[in-house]
Amino acid sequence: MVVIFTRNDALNINPQAGDTHLSVGGSDWLWAVTAVYLLSFLIFFALSLKPPHGEKIFHYLFTIGLLVGTITYYAIASGLAYSVIPTQRNRGHAASYQIFFAKYINWVVAFPVVILALGLLSGVSWATIVFNIFLAWIWVISYLCSAYTATSYKWGFFAFGTAAYLLLAFQTLHVGRTSARRLNLTRDYLMLAGWLNLLWLLYPIAFGVADGGNQISVTKSFIFFGILDLLMIPGLAFAFLFLSRKWDYSALNLHFTQYGRVNAGEGVFPEKRAPAVAAPVSAAPAATPAV
């Protein structure tokens, strides 16, 4: 492992800018995060070839999340996809701070992936799922705007994003739990949603001391964010895979990836079953009047 790290010359090939920027040690850590994402992606893709219940929806979702995470962390570990922004605080310590926008690209995909997975598990409506995804996008984009604002007005964007996060927490912990109770999946749902919201609670804190307040170094910020991201996407991916083995996919109405748009073989196709047609009731013949 030491030999591998000594070969890391990414920051020599891609020189860093800004008074506070990524260090070689930070790049080493980010390569390790990239490796975990890549390995998880390969495992998930392999498992999708023969999924339980014949359904691949959760495999598809987390495979996308893991692949995007691999690409974005590769970019960050290589010292790419960043901007240098003047700091609003600590001007005597560092006049500029390195902001990696690839991190936000990862979240724009990762947050909707877990939201969609939880929505499918809980059985909430598609309108609720779309609403939750837009809340996540508002959260991430507001934080991105905050990171790129060099004045104290950045905290306005931070407040908007945090408000969207609080709404999202309510949606996943209350609305989703209420819906999951109908399917007798309250325990599994609360385990997954509770873990996700515990991680989400730490993202505003991490942002506040990193890209927002510029209180910690770029390397320390990526140690913080890297752990959170690993526990969120790879962690939840394998948790979903483990718990889904005993879920009733028919009750969840998730039988829509084991066959194509055209029925080409045998399988469980609940939404293709036509409702039974009641037999018509014929009227009794009129009685012939007596003569």
Tell where the protein language model's regions lie, with residue ranges.
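Intrinsically disordered, low-complexity terminal tails of fungal membrane proteins
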Residues: 1-3, 249, 253-291
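First transmembrane helix
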Residues: 26-51, 77
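Hydrophobic transmembrane alpha-helical segments in integral membrane proteins
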Residues: 8-38
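Membrane-helix boundary/juxtamembrane motif in polytopic membrane proteins
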Residues: 155-158, 175-198, 218-222
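Alpha-helical transmembrane segments in multipass membrane proteins, preferentially the mid-helix core
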Residues: 42-45, 142-146, 164-185, 202-210
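Hydrophobic alpha-helical transmembrane segments of multi-pass membrane proteins
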Residues: 61-79, 201-208
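Extracellular loop 3-seventh transmembrane helix
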Residues: 25-35, 162, 190-193, 197, ...
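Internal transmembrane alpha-helix with an interfacial aromatic "cap," most often the third helix
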Residues: 43-47, 80, 84, 92-96, ...
